[in-house]
UniProtKB/Swiss-Prot annotation:
GO molecular function, one term: thioredoxin peroxidase activity
Source organism (scientific name): Arabidopsis thaliana (Mouse-ear cress)
Name listed for the protein in its UniProt record: Peroxiredoxin-2E, chloroplastic
Keyword Methyltransferase part of the UniProt annotation: no
Catalyzed chemical reaction(s): [glutaredoxin]-dithiol + a hydroperoxide = [glutaredoxin]-disulfide + an alcohol + H2O
InterPro entries (UniProt xref): PRX5-like (IPR037944), Redoxin (IPR013740), Thioredoxin-like_sf (IPR036249), Thioredoxin_domain (IPR013766)
Annotated keywords: Antioxidant, Chloroplast, Oxidoreductase, Peroxidase, Phosphoprotein, Plastid, Redox-active center, Transit peptide
UniProt key word Repeat: no
């Protein structure tokens, strides 16, 4: 059961009274601590020991709230080169494209999703860029590409399922090479769905391969990497 321990220092006394109380039928036990003990404590110190399950949840919340979302890449950096793949829809052949050739001399939006056919990616993230592709291009964007740690065959099947034509390129980072160079790996090996190591969700605006905007999500969250967010940044 939970136990509450409260320590308070009385300004008019040379000792501190410590009360230990259990929430059920156990009586309250009080004793007076020696002055040497109280001097080692900061004034108005309060310690509380709660049920471990509650503590764990609150600690997790604090961690998400205070831990900065970081990556190896940052605004002002040149995008690392890497080879991505896709299926040519007219021939079914596997084609490759390098990040450098995709971005050289162009304004490019690269956005990543944790996985093809996953709910948020299929229902919100990719369709948002498809629907806003015209607006983005009217503001000077030359290339819009979605990257995922899936193989090229899965990405092509996903493209067909979403009914995408040439609005957005769906590119495979099958081995996670580009994802690793950016430092945005998402380790999902402890999850039961078998996703393994994927990419965190992000959206990057690059001008001639140099990062101008980097909207990086915590894991697979979807809060600041949408097409609307990129339109606001232009």
């Amino acid at each position: 059961m939970a136990t509450s321990l409260s320590v308070s220092r009385f300004m008019s006394s040379s000792a501190t009274v410590i009360s230990v109380a259990k929430p059920l039928l156990s009586p309250t036990v009080s004793f007076t601590a020696p002055l040497s003990f109280t001097r080692s404590l900061a004034p108005n110190l309060s310690l509380k020991f709660r049920n471990r399950r509650t503590n764990s949840a609150s600690a997790t919340t604090r961690s998400f709230a205070t831990t900065p979302v970081t990556a190896s890449i940052s605004v002002g950096d040149k995008l690392p080169d890497s080879t991505l793949s896709y299926l040519d829809p007219s021939t079914g052949d596997v084609k490759t494209v390098t990040v450098s050739s995709l971005t050289a001399g162009k304004k490019t939006i690269l956005f990543a999703v944790p996985g093809a056919f996953t709910p948020t990616c299929s229902q919100k993230h990719v369709p948002g860029f498809v629907s806003k592709a015209g607006e983005l291009r009217s503001k000077g964007i030359d290339v819009i590409a979605c990257i995922s740690v899936n193989d090229a065959f899965v990405m092509e099947a996903w493209r067909k399922d979403l009914g995408i034509n040439d609005e957005v390129m769906l590119l495979s980072d099958g081995n996670g090479e580009f994802t690793g160079k950016l430092g945005v790996e998402l380790d999902l090996r402890d999850k039961p769905v078998g996703l393994g190591v994927r990419s965190r969700r992000y959206a990057i605006l690059a001008d001639d391969g140099v990062v101008k905007v980097l909207n990086l999500e915590e894991g697979g969250a979807f809060t600041n990497s949408s097409a609307e967010d990129m339109l606001k940044a232009l």
